[in-house]
Amino acid sequence: MPRPPRSWVCACLEGPFISRAEKGAQYEPGIRLPDPSEMEELAEAGRGWVRIVDYAPEEDVEARFLATVVRLGILACLGHTAATYEQAMRAIDGGARHATHLFNAMSPLEHRAPGVAGAMLTDRRATVEIIADGIHIHPAIARLVIAARGFRDVALITDAVAPAGLPEGDYEFVGRKITVCCGAIRLASGSLAGSMLTLDGAVRNIVTFTGIGWSEAISMATHVPATIAGVALRKGRIAPGADADLVALDDHGFVQRTWVHGHLAYQGAPGKDS
């Protein structure tokens, strides 16, 4: 089978301009304050590929970093942040338009302190994404997100890391010990370190968790993220002029075949779920 052409969409920087308090599994020595000059250097080095960047707005006190990101035409995302609701709303007012893995590595939703999650659930100027594995968020939270925002503003992501798909056991990842167990990947501290989720699994889960239809769930994994990344004219849809990146699912939502730019890239065993 000929090797299919690569189909990169963009580069997303999930660091280093994040909060140490909400670093999750990120490498703490690499975390830095949001720096407009460094962001400009990264954008230049990326030669147009850097289109999404996470940052902690509470660390960008004068909002100079956000202004730089917006001026560069890069999508500013609230992620790995301990921002208050008010700080999150000021960031949205300033041009931030997305939240990375909603509810994870961010200030929580509380009835007197809505946090970043509260801001993103109630302000339709911004889009959100969720890790629908039933571990990063409870199925009831998935239902809450869909009820508040609807499927058109919510992207499904995996947050999968290199050990995803490996048997249960201990591994080394980016110089740290991690454990794969019970469908999760954790650091020695017990903190989640990415997921074992596949995107077809996310689609199946969101249908089960929320009761939405297959077409809506598939849109959350295709058209919605393509729109967020600014590539919806050629990705995330089947239409003349769009890239022929296709996935064939069986009746249960498991991947059977994939095509990249029209080239068959994967074929599962006949009659078996992948």
Language-model features: locations:
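Structured loop/turn residues at beta-strand edges in well-structured enzyme cores
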Residues: 6, 48, 94, 152, ...
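His/Asp/Glu-enriched, well-ordered alpha-helical/loop segment
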Residues: 118-129, 134, 146-158, 163-249
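Short, function-defining helix-loop hinge/capping sites that tune catalysis or transport
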Residues: 109, 167, 173, 253, ...
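C-terminal cap of metal-dependent C-N hydrolases
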Residues: 227, 237-274
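Active-site core of metal-dependent hydrolases
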Residues: 40-168, 265
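Divalent-metal coordination cores built from histidine and acidic residues
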Residues: 1-49
